[in-house]
Each structure stands twice: as C-alpha cells, then as structure tokens.
Amino acid sequence: MNVLFVCEDNSALSIMAESILNSVAPGRFGAYSAGCYPNEWLNAHALEFLAQHRMPLANSRAKSLELFRRPGAPRMDFIITLCDVAADAQFAGWPGDPFIAHWHVETDDATGDADDVLRDNFWTLMRRIKIFASLPHGKLNRRLLERRALTLRPSYL
C-alpha cells in the first residue's frame, strides 16, 4: 500500500512522516511525501533530528504534488494531509481513487522555539503513524479502514 504525506512546502512535516512510516513499517508501505508549493531545500533541523533518531532519509528531497499525478507515478492508496494548505488542495479525480485524510499538525508555537515545535511534531507524527501502521490493512473493508484512519485526527489524540 502506498501512502503520500502532503504539507505546504515538503521541507519538514511530510518529510518526517515519510521517514517515520518507512522506519516503523518497512516493506509494508511505500511512503512518499510532497508539497503543494515545495521549497528548494529541506529543513536542516528536521533532517538533523531524523538522523539523530536513526530515521531513513533515502530520496529525501522536496517534491511537488504534481509529480504524483503524472502517468507512471506510484498509485496511492492513502493521501494524508498535514497542514491546512494541503487540506485545501484538490484531490478529486486523483488516479486510483485514494482515501484522503487530514491530520492537522500544529506548526506555530507561542514561545517561538522552532526546535521544540519540531520535536513535538515528530512525536505526534510517530504516534499517529504507529497506530495507522498497526491497522489491519487488507483485512478490513475500505469504509471501515477509512473510519479508523479518520480517528487519528488531532481531536482524538
């Protein structure tokens, strides 16, 4: 099963989510990330944090959402948006009719400490992705699986 994590710029949140899923469920999922408006660079603090936690970083580069709409792109089973900009993106008519879920991850912090926000986001994503990966994919019908995936939204965690 293929999962595409989408955020605004594909520089931190979606890169972390891709890396986490590849780490917690190797071989079970194809994890990908993209941005609605991808940066030219990745967040150096996010990459450093992932490396410190021994998370895989293969193919880590900012990618456009449009890359995954093209013919020959991997067929997505799930598209998970991580910010409001990504949630507003148009996924109607996406090839393969993937299930779309929005897991808003808060990126603003009143203290202004970017490292604290990054750390909190990493552990929030880790919890949600571990639960997502533990769902019996392939054994539940699509509607039941979709309902369970939706419970991973912030109001439930």
Which residues fall in each region the model found?
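Short, surface-exposed, charged/polar-biased interaction segments
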Residues: 24, 32, 42, 52, ...
